[in-house]
């Protein structure tokens, strides 16, 4: 849910417990500031022939600005289910609408700045893409080998989502894409 008033737009998100049960609502800003556990969607957009659509996040993003993203998606709004969120995010970010989404289950991801229950989806799309300028600077196609070679440039949560998708789709060679240890 997004609440609008003349001073600001407040995006409300559901806060969840360790088992992914909703326990509260919070503003997105408070969720980020306090590192509250929340929900997000991850959508692997692919061409059906081995290439993954990769996005470069804008520098104004509140989470990993300027990094590459192996998935589309975003934070689930309060009261929204995962599929609704995935469809909304794909349309807002990339202009993808009216295509089937495959569901690939849920996963938990945690790092220093984020605790999230993610739902993994995929869809086939060949564009053209209508990029949301506030969110995405550019997109390009990459094969899993390219993503693996450049994994330090990617958001860690999107790498986990992509790794799960590749594993669940029997791409065993690329099933464990993780950022390199510094």
Swiss-Prot record:
Where on the tree of life does the source sit, at the highest rank? Bacteria
Instruction: Name the CDD domains on file.
Output: NUDIX_Hydrolase
Q: Which GO terms describe its cellular component?
A: cytoplasm
Q: Where is the signal peptide?
A: none
Carries keyword Ribonucleoprotein? Answer: no
| Residues that hold Mg(2+) according to the record | 89, 93
Q: Which InterPro entries match?
A: NUDIX_hydrolase-like_dom_sf, NUDIX_hydrolase_dom, NUDIX_hydrolase_YfcD_pred
Q: Which UniProt keywords apply?
A: Hydrolase, Magnesium, Metal-binding
Among SUPFAM superfamilies, the record links this protein to: Nudix
Motif Nudix box at which residues? 73-95
Q: Which GO terms describe its molecular function?
A: hydrolase activity, acting on acid anhydrides, in phosphorus-containing anhydrides; metal ion binding
Give, as one word, the top-level EC class. Answer: hydrolase
Q: Which residues form the Nudix hydrolase domain?
A: 36-164
- Essential cofactor(s): Mg(2+)
EC identifiers of the protein: 3.6.-.-
Family to which the UniProt record says this protein belongs? Belongs to the Nudix hydrolase family.
Name of the protein described by the UniProt record? Uncharacterized Nudix hydrolase YPO2781/y1614/YP_2383
Its taxonomic placement starts with: Bacteria, Pseudomonadati, Pseudomonadota, Gammaproteobacteria, Enterobacterales
